[in-house]
Amino acid sequence: MSSDDERDEKELSLTSPEVVTKYKSAAEIVNKALQVVLAECKPKAKIVDICEKGDSFIKEQTASMYKNSKKKIERGVAFPTCISVNNTVGHFSPLASDESVLEDGDMVKIDMGCHIDGFIALVGHTHVLQEGPLSGRKADVIAAANTAADVALRLVRPGKKNTDVTEAIQKVAAAYDCKIVEGVLSHQLKQHVIDGNKVVLSVSSPETTVDEVEFEENEVYAIDIVASTGDGKPKLLDEKQTTIYKKDESVNYQLKMKASRFIISEIKQNFPRMPFTARSLEEKRARLGLVECVNHGHLQPYPVLYEKPGDFVAQIKFTVLLMPNGSDRITSHTLQELPKKTIEDPEIKGWLALGIKKKKGGGKKKKAQKAGEKGEASTEAEPMDASSNAQE
């Protein structure tokens, strides 16, 4: 690597304070957007309206940033707002004509993302439309996803491997008599790259394999935990429900249909690198052109998958910066009240007891107290209590 390449790499990594600021600014916006969307999740609310509200909020908030920058800075939605209910695994972000509404008692998964200058913050959260504390299998599956996310946060650290996380989250889900859903991938994030080459599998299988890799300092990951009360093997029911796509920049196939060429030109101009929703395209032409674009690899679809009717699926997704002083989780939201459950498994208890931040070396107790008086955050995270469902 040349010295220029090394400098460019450094300027785009967490060693640059400006990069850290952009990640955290994107996270602040998407965390607020999640609150806005949650407030709209009520019985009889139209799902497409909620999705539109989430995306609009992110666009409005990011539009006011870096307006006076000398170079044009891309910013906005990094992943369209999705509202996936009950046994729907994810990626449900319907077209404007869709009449789907939320109902009382629905388990709602919200998935969304924001970026500033291509530095991406993603978040996923699960909420049940009911008053008071949760119970039964709905509570179990949310607790399973949340505890698995807490364990993943402690294992996505320099020196650990992606396979360590895959094995651990499955063990956690089993403690709640739930399954981690197959086919869900957690990716390293880089500037303008939502699906980096370092990948954590939700479930390893002969059909789905990735290279074993080690986490390293100054990397960023979006960790996506999806748990189910069912068998964790979701199915595609209707290809027409797919509305989220991402352009594959490596494909150069010459499209035949005029509608396809029009659509791909529009996508290149408006969504060159981030996933987008077909709602953002001219609907009639999109219907005609998207099929050829997908068939020839120009677009990567994000399909809407389902577990069996009666199953419940919960998601917790977060973005984490692997800083020199430890892991910094920058996206989250507080869960509803869950019943306490004691985890007996010593290995899971051990994972939950791991700190997230590194201890400061050579610091004396007095100095630590002084820092505390000034309101500085402790550099050693509180270990999780394995006897309760600690909430985000």
Curated annotation (Swiss-Prot):
<dbReference type="GO" id="GO:0044843">
    <property type="term" value="P:cell cycle G1/S phase transition"/>
</dbReference>
<dbReference type="InterPro" id="IPR004545">
    <property type="entry name" value="PA2G4"/>
</dbReference>
<keyword id="KW-0539">Nucleus</keyword>
<comment type="similarity">
    <text>Belongs to the peptidase M24 family.</text>
</comment>
<dbReference type="GO" id="GO:0001558">
    <property type="term" value="P:regulation of cell growth"/>
</dbReference>
<keyword id="KW-0217">Developmental protein</keyword>
<dbReference type="GO" id="GO:0003729">
    <property type="term" value="F:mRNA binding"/>
</dbReference>
<dbReference type="GO" id="GO:1990904">
    <property type="term" value="C:ribonucleoprotein complex"/>
</dbReference>
<dbReference type="InterPro" id="IPR036390">
    <property type="entry name" value="WH_DNA-bd_sf"/>
</dbReference>
<feature type="compositionally biased region" description="Basic residues">
    <location>
        <begin position="358"/>
        <end position="369"/>
    </location>
</feature>
<feature type="region of interest" description="RNA-binding">
    <location>
        <begin position="48"/>
        <end position="56"/>
    </location>
</feature>
<keyword id="KW-0698">rRNA processing</keyword>
<comment type="function">
    <text>Binds RNA. Associates with 28S, 18S and 5.8S mature rRNAs, several rRNA precursors and probably U3 small nucleolar RNA. May be involved in regulation of intermediate and late steps of rRNA processing. May be involved in ribosome assembly. Required for expression of cell cycle genes such as CYCD3-1, RNR2A and CDKB1-1. Promotes, in a dose- and auxin-dependent manner, organ growth by stimulating both cell proliferation and expansion, via the regulation of RBR1 levels.</text>
</comment>
<dbReference type="GO" id="GO:0051302">
    <property type="term" value="P:regulation of cell division"/>
</dbReference>
<feature type="region of interest" description="Disordered">
    <location>
        <begin position="358"/>
        <end position="392"/>
    </location>
</feature>
<dbReference type="GO" id="GO:0006364">
    <property type="term" value="P:rRNA processing"/>
</dbReference>
<feature type="region of interest" description="Necessary for nucleolar localization">
    <location>
        <begin position="1"/>
        <end position="50"/>
    </location>
</feature>
<dbReference type="GO" id="GO:0009734">
    <property type="term" value="P:auxin-activated signaling pathway"/>
</dbReference>
<feature type="region of interest" description="Necessary for nucleolar localization">
    <location>
        <begin position="298"/>
        <end position="392"/>
    </location>
</feature>
<keyword id="KW-0687">Ribonucleoprotein</keyword>
<dbReference type="Pfam" id="PF00557">
    <property type="entry name" value="Peptidase_M24"/>
</dbReference>
<feature type="region of interest" description="Interaction with RNA">
    <location>
        <begin position="355"/>
        <end position="372"/>
    </location>
</feature>
<protein>
    <recommendedName>
        <fullName>ERBB-3 BINDING PROTEIN 1</fullName>
    </recommendedName>
</protein>
<dbReference type="GO" id="GO:0005730">
    <property type="term" value="C:nucleolus"/>
</dbReference>
<keyword id="KW-0927">Auxin signaling pathway</keyword>
<dbReference type="GO" id="GO:0005634">
    <property type="term" value="C:nucleus"/>
</dbReference>
<dbReference type="InterPro" id="IPR036388">
    <property type="entry name" value="WH-like_DNA-bd_sf"/>
</dbReference>
<dbReference type="InterPro" id="IPR000994">
    <property type="entry name" value="Pept_M24"/>
</dbReference>
<dbReference type="InterPro" id="IPR036005">
    <property type="entry name" value="Creatinase/aminopeptidase-like"/>
</dbReference>
<dbReference type="InterPro" id="IPR047113">
    <property type="entry name" value="PA2G4/ARX1"/>
</dbReference>
<dbReference type="GO" id="GO:0005829">
    <property type="term" value="C:cytosol"/>
</dbReference>
<keyword id="KW-0694">RNA-binding</keyword>
<dbReference type="InterPro" id="IPR001714">
    <property type="entry name" value="Pept_M24_MAP"/>
</dbReference>
<feature type="short sequence motif" description="Nuclear localization signal">
    <location>
        <begin position="357"/>
        <end position="367"/>
    </location>
</feature>
<comment type="subunit">
    <text>Component of a ribonucleoprotein complex. Interacts with REIL1 and REIL2.</text>
</comment>
